């Protein structure tokens, strides 16, 4: 009897093991397909994760700005951070809301804050993975040299839907990074 029960439950356990990651993939694809498209300015670096490969550790200048928490919220509450494209074409945090809106991602207020306090918002994207070959080329071309600033402006294309934000694409100098690599490599080298 015990063995029969195990044999009956085993397929259910296997199905659940596949269902959870599959649901996450489907949700992410839905956000990429139907979400609000915006671009955020980046402060990139290109570290290496031995187990996962090359990625950009994402840091956003927008995270350094302070915002006032709306009335009626306290630590532990979920608010919605509204991103809108500015005149520069980049996404900026325009307001914090207690209700979900288009172009807003969910953010949980740390416990030590209450309504009226000023807070900095951490955008919940920390890494953008790249194919190894592309990452090495970008690292060589984009790196700081002799205390110079980077040679390109980097932005991250994101999609937002139902309070979730996902990374979609990396842009360098206003173009998708693969186009930028192709164009940058086709330019003749300048002599010193």
Residue ranges and their predicted role:
Residues 5-24:
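Hydrophobic membrane-insertion alpha-helices, especially the h-region
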Residues 39-71:
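Short extracytoplasmic
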Residues 35-37, 55-57, 76-78, 88, ...:
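Extracytoplasmic
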Residues 44, 54, 62, 85-87, ...:
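A mature extracytoplasmic/lumenal domain signature
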Residues 18-40:
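Aromatic-capped interface at the extracytoplasmic side
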Residues 6, 55, 59, 64, ...:
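Cell-surface/extracellular proteins and modules involved
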Residues 50-51, 64-75, 89-94, 165-167:
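Short, Lys/Arg- and Gly-enriched loop/turn segments at beta-strand edges
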């Amino acid at each position: 009897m015990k063995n029969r029960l195990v044999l009956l439950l085993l397929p259910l356990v296997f199905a659940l093991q596949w269902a959870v990651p599959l649901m996450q993939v489907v949700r992410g694809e839905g956000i990429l397909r139907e979400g609000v498209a915006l671009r955020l300015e980046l402060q990139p670096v290109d570290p290496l994760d031995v187990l996962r490969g090359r990625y950009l550790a994402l840091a956003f200048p927008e995270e350094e700005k302070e915002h006032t928490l709306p009335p009626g919220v306290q630590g532990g509450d979920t608010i919605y951070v509204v991103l809108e494209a500015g005149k520069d074409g980049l996404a900026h945090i325009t307001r914090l809301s207690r209700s979900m809106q288009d172009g807003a991602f969910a953010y949980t207020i740390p416990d030590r804050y209450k309504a009226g306090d000023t807070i900095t918002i951490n955008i919940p994207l920390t890494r953008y993975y790249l194919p190894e070959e592309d990452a090495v080329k970008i690292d060589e071309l984009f790196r700081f040299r002799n205390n110079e600033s980077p040679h390109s402006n980097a932005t991250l294309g994101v999609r937002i839907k139902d309070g979730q934000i996902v990374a979609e694409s990396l842009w360098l100098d206003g173009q998708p990074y693969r186009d930028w690599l192709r164009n940058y490599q086709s330019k003749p080298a300048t002599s010193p």
